[in-house]
Amino acid sequence: MADKMFAGLSFEQVVERYNQTVVSVCVMRLKNWADAEDCFQNTFVSLYSKKPELMSETHLKACLIRVAINECNNYIKKNKRIVSLENRKDEAVEFPLDETDISWALLELPDKYRQVLYLHYVCQYKVEEIAEILEKNPNTIKTTLKRGRDKLKSIYGGDLCER
């Protein structure tokens, strides 16, 4: 590929460094490996088609997460009217990553909780950073975190998400 630079990294280095993060976001959002692969590829195609800007690695990671979420949302909207004969809950989702118990538990939650809890506990973003990525008020993120933790506790019990 051409010598475009993103936050001082070549495109290949960006893909290598952030592929697991983008795959995880896509799988968490879509709950289907094949669909997640499509959105994963579209995320990096979208990044490459943009003009490289001077940005920090942190900003680049946040940008990739936001683009991945948008790609997944667009995919869901596009395929919303297609009736699936498969029951997606019965479909096995395989991750090429070493996922923690919390990552698997998040798959049981509705999207609005899953995204916020994933970004907070797995990606270790602060509330303010999540608010910026998802373009929401920090207080909304705090409320969503609390409600998501409560839902996890009701499903699994105990101190699964105490931090």
Would you name each region that the model predicts?
Residues 3-4, 31, 42-59, 78-80:
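Sigma70-family region 2
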Residues 55, 66-85, 147:
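Arg/Lys-rich amphipathic alpha helix in sigma70-family domain 2
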Residues 15, 23, 33-49, 63:
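Conserved RNAP core-binding helix
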Residues 77, 109, 149-163:
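Short, Lys/Arg-enriched C-terminal cap helix and immediately downstream tail that follows
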Residues 116-120:
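A short pre-motif secondary-structure segment
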Residues 1-24, 28, 37:
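A short, charge-rich alpha-helical start-of-domain segment used by transcription regulators
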Residues 74, 81-107, 126:
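Internal acidic/polar
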Residues 69, 134-158:
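DNA-recognition helix of helix-turn-helix
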